[in-house]
């Protein structure tokens, strides 16, 4: 399949509008051309600074604009982060993601996050951060410290975006992704379904992602988790088949990207998740919590993997581990 960056909305809509089973079959066929069919990349996400975010994202418990009852926490110590990363690796994660509720990191924060990247990288884990907007200098320093991925989601279509966020623009997000790409890091960018958007908005989101100069290496497809106290607390729940359609279309138009099951997975049945894997999802966040929202725990995931015959993608060994293996050979 030829890799394309010129997908039109009409083409993407034609994929969405296929009969459900035809769409899932096509997505699984594309998936098998580029990935091992039964291998899932497992990531762990840790909040390194929680709450009091100045942004007004209407879905988010961490926004200072809403009364979500979330207790804000100061940034956590680097050694605590390293301990959590080591535990994540031992439980089967190959990528460790660190998120801070900032509009953007201040210069005083940079030594803290750079040390964190270096220490987590030394464990043999892929590293990812989501810290808000970046300038080019910050992106380059993160890359030099060893950061593999930077997450900055588009959230929704350009047209629907202003209904969800007013404190940063859609182009602000694209600019940060440009800085990440130019620094040589891998881009992690996706969105959220179930925000009250239309299917046309989901098409618009995927078109933005699939027409970037390089497809994002990782594409999280989140299901809204309604949070009490936020403006979207009472939004009508999206049917799960529409979420699976979105995953399938993402797989077809971005065949080399990891498509990740992210927020909202905790409320899904094993059968729903199996369909998502059939539709081409091959990455997920494991652990009891995603920043501040509930998530399927490691024990549930181990049972699910065993039931479906799935295996976790392996983390890379550290230099020390390679040395021990060489000595015992």
From Swiss-Prot:
Family matches, as InterPro entries: Aldolase_TIM, BATS_dom, Biotin_synth/BioAB, Biotin_synthase, Elp3/MiaA/NifB-like_rSAM, rSAM
Cofactor binding, per record: Binds 1 [4Fe-4S] cluster. The cluster is coordinated with 3 cysteines and an exchangeable S-adenosyl-L-methionine.
Class in the EC hierarchy, top level: transferase
GO terms for biological process, alphabetical: biotin biosynthetic process
EC annotation from Swiss-Prot or TrEMBL: 2.8.1.6
Binding residue positions for [4Fe-4S] cluster: 53, 57, 60
Protein name listed in UniProt: Biotin synthase
Originating organism: Acinetobacter calcoaceticus
């Amino acid at each position: 399949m030829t890799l394309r960056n010129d997908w039109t909305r009409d083409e993407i809509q034609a994929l969405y509008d296929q009969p459900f089973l035809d769409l899932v079959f096509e997505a699984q066929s594309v998936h098998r051309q580029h990935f091992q069919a039964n291998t899932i990349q497992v990531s762990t996400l840790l909040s390194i600074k929680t709450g009091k975010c100045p942004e007004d994202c209407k879905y988010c418990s961490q926004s200072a604009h809403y009364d979500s009852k979330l207790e804000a926490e100061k940034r956590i110590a680097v050694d605590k982060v390293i301990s959590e990363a080591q535990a994540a690796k031992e439980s089967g994660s190959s990528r460790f993601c660190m998120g801070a509720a900032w509009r953007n990191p201040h210069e005083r924060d940079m030594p803290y996050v750079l040390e964190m990247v270096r220490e987590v990288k030394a464990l043999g884990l892929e590293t990812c951060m989501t810290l808000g907007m970046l300038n080019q200098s910050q992106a380059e320093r993160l890359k030099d410290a060893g950061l593999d991925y930077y997450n900055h989601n588009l959230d929704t279509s350009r047209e629907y975006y202003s209904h969800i966020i007013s404190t940063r623009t859609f182009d602000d997000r694209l600019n940060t992704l440009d800085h990440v790409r130019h620094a040589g890091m891998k881009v992690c960018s996706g969105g959220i379904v179930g925000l009250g958007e239309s299917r046309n908005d989901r098409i618009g989101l995927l078109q933005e992602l699939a027409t970037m100069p390089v497809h994002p290496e990782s594409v999280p497809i989140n299901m809204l988790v309604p949070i009490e106290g936020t403006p979207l607390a009472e939004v009508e729940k999206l049917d799960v088949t529409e979420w699976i359609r979105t995953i399938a279309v993402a797989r077809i138009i971005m065949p080399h990207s990891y498509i990740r099951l992210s927020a909202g997975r905790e409320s899904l049945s094993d059968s729903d998740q199996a369909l998502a894997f059939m539709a081409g999802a091959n990455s997920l966040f494991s652990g009891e919590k995603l920043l501040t929202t509930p998530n399927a725990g490691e024990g549930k995931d181990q049972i699910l993997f065993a039931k479906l015959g799935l295996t976790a993608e392996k983390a890379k060994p550290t230099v020390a581990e390679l040395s021990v293996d060489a000595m015992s050979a």
